[in-house]
């Protein structure tokens, strides 16, 4: 039976580093206030002439290099993003062009912070069905372009960046992407959204959020989804090496760990370095875990994310 395995991981953060102290010069906040409530210490901001596709390409190049896969062997490119270069064409087709992956078909997926999990599920199913052998799965965002920089409740939370993985056909049993579960609840769409839209008013708008309610849903839904995927695969928390949750807020990660009795040392934490990068969050955290020597071959990993929509998802992977 066909399955897909992560062969390579890559990440990219733009050059401009903005610390909490930098933000304190423009809005009523402080490093202490931000760190205590979010765990965020800094974020990276894309240059004015830097597009989502540019960052996606840099992350993809590193993932391809890490995998040893030739770009001409890529059959599919899926880009998870909320902030594409343009309304159309898709960011993925621009990435395909810049990478010169001439044999790949490409499209975007929009599930905001859950986007990378959704993209993984889609690419995994294409591989399992036999339609493709190699897929690039990318999460990339320029969240800074949809922020109100005078609103301290949102502008301190987000950053820009990109992460990518190479998924390839794998014949070994119980390795690679073992299981994925996706969820949506559109009745909660008004908890987190932008004030604009192509059809709505013709502008991108800025992020609007009911932070308290989103926080509560994140803890509840991430916890429940992790329990479900472990039960589905007859696994215990003790058997999992790493839990990589969406890097939105350190308190969410800590409270999920406490609720499920997950040892803190099993939680991958990178939010302090790059803030909430939406769809790029999970691959950035994976890249951090690998580069820091935490993530090893054959490790069992749970990936889980929640985002606007509301959408959420969980993925069980054997590295």
Swiss-Prot record:
Q: Its Enzyme Commission number?
A: 2.3.1.180
What catalytic activity is recorded? malonyl-[ACP] + acetyl-CoA + H(+) = 3-oxobutanoyl-[ACP] + CO2 + CoA
CDD domains recorded for this chain? Answer: KAS_III
Q: Where in the cell is it found?
A: Cytoplasm
Q: What is its main location?
A: cytoplasm
Name the Pfam families on file.
ACP_syn_III, ACP_syn_III_C
A single GO CC term for this protein reads:
cytoplasm
Taxonomy, superkingdom: Bacteria
Catalytic residues identified in the record: 113, 246, 276
Where is the segment annotated ACP-binding?
247-251
> Which GO MF terms does the UniProt record name?
3-oxoacyl-[acyl-carrier-protein] synthase activity; beta-ketoacyl-acyl-carrier-protein synthase III activity
Q: Which GO terms describe its biological process?
A: fatty acid biosynthetic process; secondary metabolite biosynthetic process
Q: In which pathway does it act?
A: Lipid metabolism; fatty acid biosynthesis
Family per UniProt? Belongs to the thiolase-like superfamily. FabH family.
Function description: Catalyzes the condensation reaction of fatty acid synthesis by the addition to an acyl acceptor of two carbons from malonyl-ACP. Catalyzes the first condensation reaction which initiates fatty acid synthesis and may therefore play a role in governing the total rate of fatty acid production. Possesses both acetoacetyl-ACP synthase and acetyl transacylase activities. Its substrate specificity determines the biosynthesis of branched-chain and/or straight-chain of fatty acids.
List the HAMAP family hit by this protein, alphabetically. Answer: FabH
Q: How does it assemble?
A: Homodimer.
User: What is the protein name given in its UniProt record?
Assistant: Beta-ketoacyl-[acyl-carrier-protein] synthase III
This protein's encoding gene: fabH
